[in-house]
């Protein structure tokens, strides 16, 4: 039987327990962990890179508003490298109410995502 991916959040005051859970999930044969942006997905992914050996993990999802493509590209490249390629970057546009809270004007989602990915790809020579 193929096991599904699990989803975990780096809850404040529970981060060490979450990493222990990830190690246990790997031991039991789960293939991957989804890391929602709730609770700092990038920080969790860096930690997962260091406490697991085979488990794949990914952001689910990292919003494109509020952080530059250059910064996200650099972070994703770092995690990809230290994890031996087990990290995947999941991107999304979120929704208008959330984006407004960031003080950002949301454009057409497909156009915004296309422009973001284009900017992200331009960073490849610097980020890896």
Q: What residue spans do the PLM features occupy?
A:
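N-terminal beta1-alpha1-beta2 module of alpha/beta enzyme domains
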Residues: 1-59
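Aromatic/hydrophobic pocket-lining residues that form the small-molecule binding cavity
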Residues: 18, 41, 45, 69-72, ...
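Internal, glycine-rich beta/alpha segment that forms the wall or movable "lid"
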Residues: 2-4, 73-128
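Short, glycine/charged-enriched secondary-structure capping and boundary segments
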Residues: 21-22, 47-50, 71-74, 102-106
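A short, GP-enriched loop/loop-strand-helix hinge that lies immediately N-terminal to
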Residues: 56-62, 89-92
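Active-site-proximal loop/turn and secondary-structure-junction residues that shape catalytic pockets
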Residues: 12, 39, 63-65, 93-97
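Glycine-rich "substrate-gating" loop/helix at the edge of Rossmann-like oxidoreductase active sites
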Residues: 62-67, 105-106
């Amino acid at each position: 039987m193929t096991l599904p991916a699990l989803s975990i959040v780096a809850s404040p005051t529970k981060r060490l327990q979450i990493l222990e859970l990830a190690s246990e999930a790997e031991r039991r044969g789960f293939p991957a962990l989804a890391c929602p942006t709730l609770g700092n997905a990038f920080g969790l992914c860096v930690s997962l890179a260091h406490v697991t050996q085979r488990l794949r993990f990914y952001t689910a999802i990292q919003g494109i508003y509020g952080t530059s493509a250059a910064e996200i590209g650099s972070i994703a490249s770092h995690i990809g490298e230290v994890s031996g390629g087990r990290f995947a970057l999941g991107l999304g546009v979120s929704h208008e109410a959330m984006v407004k809270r960031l003080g950002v004007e949301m454009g057409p989602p497909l156009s915004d995502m296309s422009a973001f990915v284009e900017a992200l790809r331009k960073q490849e020579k610097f980020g890896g």
